[in-house]
Regions:
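Conserved Helicase C-terminal RecA-like lobe
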Residues: 1, 18, 31, 35-41, ...
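Conserved pre-motif I regulatory segment
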Residues: 1-25
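Conserved helix-turn-beta segment of the N-terminal RecA-like "Helicase ATP-binding" lobe
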Residues: 61-86, 176-179
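Conserved Walker A/P-loop ATP-binding site and its immediately adjacent core
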Residues: 35, 50-72, 163-168, 328-329
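A conserved SF2-helicase RecA2
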Residues: 389-459
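SF2 helicase motor core recognition
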Residues: 110-115, 164-166, 330-334, 351-355, ...
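Conserved P-loop NTPase motor "coupling/switch" region that bridges the ATPase
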Residues: 78, 97, 124, 141-232, ...
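Conserved helix/coil segment N-terminal to the catalytic DExD/H
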Residues: 88-122
Length: 459
């Protein structure tokens, strides 16, 4: 297929070529993969400035998206892409093939550095979804940081560089420019641009930006950062977002209240114990969706209200495929049981079948199938069975359908259990307040509704 680059894509390609170390903050749907591959093609095969390229991406994107995109476009026919995914033998075979472009899953980086760090073969590295490197204490960050002196070009790609806070971008730029712009240490960056927010006498729980610090941060990184928004460049399909209220049956409502009050709930086949605020948030979300994991590891059915509501939405779609985003494994099992026509979208074959219209109900987990996947050809209806706290995963999953190439208006439905933590999660997503402190505040609010203020103060 012939690639006719839009003006914004041409500008992005040139930016990568002209900036050895840079960040592309490209909104979902702008074509960051073909942009980057086009820049690689120019750098490696026209200018001879790059010999080998490593693409670090979410597992499924590393396995499927980059090779598929290279094969799709005529001008990229000379690019050979090796996928270093699988067991150690398969990964080594791909790396030692000498392919111009090698793709790896991000969790493979420690293994890669341990085995190939001394004779590091890649002079250019692409961080696809660089926000996954926001934790400077992670093994992947430390491993990649150790080989930075051997890398001459680094490109970071993401649509959500700071999903929770501008604290998230420090580690990404530490890898991009070696600490030149935002400093070599997180503590120095934090002290310069942030001040304590929520704290106790001995511990700081959250940080907030100092006055105009965000503008100062943007000014620091501006010379190596290109940011583009989809609304400025794409004719995207209209998106309708709706909340579908779900009423819990009386027994489930009583169970929800008891769990909120006591943080304990006895079920017929096991005990549910929420040990802290984060644990209680998780348990309340499980219960709102219909089942609970017990201390014994079993999933106990509490209600089927959301299953029934989903059935009505599927029926209303009148045969049009519906994508359902789930969060808990217990929900996946229940969905597969309740809807025999459903199929989990977990591998390349199932995603091809979805795009071909062969799957009437596709079940997707946003954590494993959000970034970089093109699923817009298979349908335009999406239902959130359980809405997660993660704004990044939420936006990325929605963009699988609401993206360039979608031929129909997109409908996104949220099954929200009335008067439960579901309502607070969706509100947090709407206001983009999805920090840990928002989660704690939501749990406090749930406890306060049970008239046990002393319990709420424990957090």
């Amino acid at each position: 297929m012939q690639f006719n680059a839009h003006d914004y894509q041409r500008a992005a390609i040139d930016y990568v070529v002209e900036h050895p170390r840079c960040a592309l903050f490209l909104d979902m749907g702008l074509g960051k993969t073909v942009i980057t591959l086009s820049a690689i093609q120019d750098l490696a095969l026209n200018r001879f400035e790059v010999s080998r390229v490593l693409v670090i991406a979410p597992l499924r994107v590393a396995r499927d998206t980059w090779a598929d995109e290279a094969a799709k476009w005529d001008h990229l026919a000379s690019l050979d892409v090796a996928c270093a995914v699988g067991d150690a033998k398969q990964r080594s075979k791909a790396i030692e093939s000498g392919a111009l472009v090698t793709t790896v899953g991000r969790d493979t980086i420690p293994w890669l550095v341990e085995n190939y760090g001394k004779a590091w073969p890649f002079d250019m590295v692409i961080l696809d979804e660089s926000s996954s490197f926001k934790n400077h204490q992670s093994k992947r960050f430390k491993a990649l940081k150790s080989v930075l002196p051997k890398i001459t070009r680094m490109v970071a790609l993401t649509g959500t560089p700071a999903p929770n806070s501008l604290l998230d971008i420090w580690a990404q730029f530490r890898l991009i420019d070696g600490g030149q712009r935002l400093g070599h240490f997180l503590t120095h960056y934090r002290d310069e641009f942030f001040q304590p927010d929520k704290r106790s006498a001995a511990q700081i729980f959250t940080w907030k930006l100092k006055h105009d610090a965000d503008l100062a941060i943007y000014a620091r990184i501006n010379d190596i950062t290109l940011s583009m928004s989809a609304v400025d460049h794409l004719d995207l399909p209209p998106v309708t977002s709706t909340v579908v209220p779900v009423d819990l049956p009386a027994p489930a409502r009583r169970a929800y209240k008891q769990l909120g009050e006591q943080m304990l709930l006895a079920l017929p086949h096991g005990l549910v114990d929420a040990k802290n605020a984060a644990g209680l948030s998780n348990k309340l979300m499980q219960l709102a969706s219909g089942s609970l994991y017990t201390e014994q590891g079993t999933a106990e059915l509490v209600h089927s209200a959301k299953i029934e509501a989903l059935g009505e939405l599927i029926e209303a779609a009148s045969g049009s495929p519906v994508m359902v985003a789930y969060w808990f494994k217990s929900d996946l099992a229940r969905l597969l049981e309740a809807f025999p026509q459903a199929r989990e979208l977990s591998d390349a074959a199932s995603m091809r079948d979805w795009n071909a219209g062969r799957i009437p109900v596709g079940l997707i987990h946003p954590a494993s199938a959000g970034h970089g996947l093109n699923l817009q050809e298979g349908g335009h209806h999406m239902v959130w069975y359980t809405v997660p706290w993660s704004l990044e995963l939420y936006q990325q999953a929605n963009a699988r359908l609401a993206r360039q190439g979608q031929r129909f208006p997109v409908s996104i439905h949220h099954l929200i259990a009335r008067s439960t933590i579901d309502e607070r999660v969706i509100k947090a997503l709407e206001t983009k307040d999805v920090t840990q402190s928002a989660l704690i505040d939501a749990v406090k609010a749930e406890l306060a509704k049970t008239n046990h203020p002393s319990s709420a103060k424990e957090f």
